[in-house]
């Protein structure tokens, strides 16, 4: 039997324009992940970054464990790929976000997250050896300009702000790789078995970070409830919806769901945290929405 490479990706099964199911998945992803940045900020009020990351993955794994399909068998030959996903999709980015958000607002973190489709498209082109179509390239370019506008105010701030924004951007790079690697696995087994096992791997990897965070953490219901919501929605149901969307439309177009996160993140940050957003960041948000529309059209 021919051995599959450790790193592989494929196209989605749906090549035409988004339909009602795809847009519904996209909206739910944007709502759940857009709120995640607010939940992280609330969690950081009393918990260290490692504990926030470990807690959200733990709750997410418990959520998926309750679904029978999560326990469906997978080929042992694919376990190394799932373990790799546990690092690049779960452990690394989910730890980098709370570390970075110690120095930046939740709305800024959400807006930077809009860069995922840019990296997803570049990595997909490399792995698939296929360049995106003209419409997708235009959408990616417009979205990339929008992300630069969103990121620009952070470059004018203190060094800690730049560091925090940079760590969040690094997490986004991991996401760009992960959405590509997840496609063949989720098409082979479905979303739940892959996600559940990847989260179990991430729990092991994040355990040392959680232990390091314990001395600087104290229990508070506000932070505990935020982490619970973060795990149930942001690490449970949102990942299921995302892998379902990516499996249907491919990594490049599926990742456009990330374009809509800034809208939710900005609204929640302004309403609940009294955060301020620079005008250029709002312009950038409009650009990434335009890029999302173009990228989601027929290839």
Would you name each region that the model predicts?
Residues 7, 58, 64, 123, ...:
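Hydrophobic transmembrane alpha-helices of multi-pass small-molecule transport proteins
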Residues 51-62, 89, 94-131, 135-136, ...:
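Specific alpha-helical transmembrane segments that line the substrate/conduction pathway
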Residues 31-40, 65-113, 149, 231-249:
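Specific transmembrane alpha-helical segments of multi-pass solute transporters/efflux pumps
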Residues 18-23, 45-50, 54, 74-80, ...:
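Juxtamembrane helix-entry segments on the extracytoplasmic side of multipass membrane proteins
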Residues 61-64, 120-122, 126, 140, ...:
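Transmembrane alpha-helical segments that form core, pore/gating elements
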Residues 54-55, 90, 109-115, 179-204, ...:
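Helix-helix packing/entry segments at the starts of transmembrane helices
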Residues 2-54, 99, 157-184:
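Glycine-/small-residue-enriched transmembrane alpha-helix faces in small-molecule transporters
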Residues 34, 38, 65, 86-91, ...:
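Hydrophobic/small/kink-forming positions within alpha-helical transmembrane segments
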